[in-house]
Amino acid sequence: MQSFSDMAEDGGERFSSLRFAGLNSQNSPQAECEPLKNLGFRLQYLEEQGQPDISVIDSQVHLWSMRPELIQLLIDAHASFNLLPRTLFLAVNILDRYCSKQTVYEQYYKLAGLSALLISSKLVDPPDHTPHMQDLLKFCQCDYDRSILIKMERHILKILDWSMRNATVYDFVQLMTCDGGS
């Protein structure tokens, strides 16, 4: 099996965007592979740009103890709303990048996670699959209201300078599972 680097150098132009064709209980994930020059460079650049600064998150000790519960909530919401796999990976990345650029107080950590999931869903999922804010808030049984969720969503976008594109683990897995370009 070729490594990612070998594929990018030898035939990276075979791949351009990795779109998820669909996933449900009857279908397996399918990747569509399209031409692109310098795929390795592009994915590496996106990955580097999308890495959170863990040392900043480490300084917010309370986040690590709350993280397992929040990640489980995001996984449950992701499954409940039948969102695409990439949505969850991107949501966690958005949350981590936000927490590495902004001090997040305990009472707002869950709100930041839900907002990250909502942002991610708007970017990745078809418009008719994006959860409505009220449904998301009802699902998590939160004390937040729609207006605070909107404010957090805007704040995350502002702090991250509207930079939502990045390469996730899911993108690399999709690349590795692409049919050899035939």
Language-model segments: residues:
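Short, intrinsically disordered, charge-balanced linker/junction segments flanking boundaries
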Residues: 177-182
